[in-house]
């Protein structure tokens, strides 16, 4: 693998992880804030809100994991080599 392809792969992997973390990070913060606000308004619904929050956080975190998988593929199983 030449140095240009190697450098481009490292840059693409860094962008994949970085950009894949921005959206879910903002979404998780917003969802957690809304959940806290909802629990403060209706404390009796805390269990249902928390369950829904944890499920939605898991789905959001999956997007970041997909970005990590793309980065690992670019670094270790480079399709451009």
From Swiss-Prot:
Concerning InterPro entries, the annotation shows: ATP_synth_csu_bac/chlpt (IPR005953), ATP_synth_F0_csu (IPR000454), ATP_synth_F0_csu_DDCD_BS (IPR020537), ATP_synth_F0_csu_sf (IPR038662), ATPase_proteolipid_c-like_dom (IPR002379), F/V-ATP_Csub_sf (IPR035921)
Q: Name one GO molecular function term.
A: lipid binding
- In this chain's numbering, which residues are marked as the site (Reversibly protonated during proton transport)? 61
Q: Where in the cell is it found?
A: Cellular thylakoid membrane
* Pfam families assigned to the protein according to its UniProt record, in alphabetical order: ATP-synt_C (PF00137)
What top-level branch of life does the organism fall under?
Answer: Bacteria
Membrane topology, from the record? Multi-pass membrane protein
User: Which keywords, in A-to-Z order, does the entry hold?
Assistant: ATP synthesis, CF(0), Hydrogen ion transport, Ion transport, Lipid-binding, Membrane, Thylakoid, Transmembrane, Transmembrane helix, Transport
Give GO cellular component annotations, separated by semicolons: plasma membrane-derived thylakoid membrane; proton-transporting ATP synthase complex; proton-transporting two-sector ATPase complex, proton-transporting domain
Transmembrane annotation, as ranges: 7-27, 57-77
The role this protein plays is: F(1)F(0) ATP synthase produces ATP from ADP in the presence of a proton or sodium gradient. F-type ATPases consist of two structural domains, F(1) containing the extramembraneous catalytic core and F(0) containing the membrane proton channel, linked together by a central stalk and a peripheral stalk. During catalysis, ATP synthesis in the catalytic domain of F(1) is coupled via a rotary mechanism of the central stalk subunits to proton translocation. Key component of the F(0) channel; it plays a direct role in translocation across the membrane. A homomeric c-ring of between 10-14 subunits forms the central stalk rotor element with the F(1) delta and epsilon subunits.
Q: Which family does it belong to?
A: Belongs to the ATPase C chain family.
Report the HAMAP family cross-referenced here: ATP_synth_c_bact
Q: How does it assemble?
A: F-type ATPases have 2 components, F(1) - the catalytic core - and F(0) - the membrane proton channel. F(1) has five subunits: alpha(3), beta(3), gamma(1), delta(1), epsilon(1). F(0) has four main subunits: a(1), b(1), b'(1) and c(10-14). The alpha and beta chains form an alternating ring which encloses part of the gamma chain. F(1) is attached to F(0) by a central stalk formed by the gamma and epsilon chains, while a peripheral stalk is formed by the delta, b and b' chains.
Q: What is this protein called?
A: ATP synthase subunit c
Biological source species: Synechococcus elongatus (strain ATCC 33912 / PCC 7942 / FACHB-805)
């Amino acid at each position: 693998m030449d140095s240009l392809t190697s450098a481009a792969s490292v840059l693409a992997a860094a962008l994949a992880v970085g950009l894949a973390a921005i959206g879910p990070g903002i979404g998780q913060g917003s969802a957690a804030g809304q959940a806290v606000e909802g629990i403060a308004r209706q404390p009796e619904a805390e269990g249902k809100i928390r369950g829904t929050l944890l499920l939605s956080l898991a789905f959001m975190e999956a997007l970041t994991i997909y970005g990590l998988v793309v980065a690992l593929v670019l670094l270790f199983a480079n399709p451009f080599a």
